[in-house]
Amino acid sequence: MATKTLKVTQTKSGIGRLPKHRATLTGLGLRRIGHTVELEDTPSVRGMINKVYYMVSVEG
């Protein structure tokens, strides 16, 4: 059975944001605006996305 995945794209810069939010972007594997990563749909990943929802867009 295949695991569900989410496509997360960074839409805004991490410059001038809270250090914890910048660290969360790094934890998600995002490096720059427009960068997209595919991540497993787990509660921990969902929590990280919820923390920086205003800087990312999610598909899937």
Swiss-Prot record:
Task: Say yes or no: keyword Ribonucleoprotein present.
Answer: yes
Signal peptide per UniProt: none
Could you give a GO molecular-function term held by this entry? structural constituent of ribosome
Protein's GO biological process = translation
- Mind telling me which HAMAP family this protein's record contains? Ribosomal_uL30_B
- NCBIfam families xref list: rpmD_bact
Give the quaternary structure.
Part of the 50S ribosomal subunit.
Name of protein = Large ribosomal subunit protein uL30
* Annotated source species: Shewanella denitrificans (strain OS217 / ATCC BAA-1090 / DSM 15013)
Give the gene name: rpmD
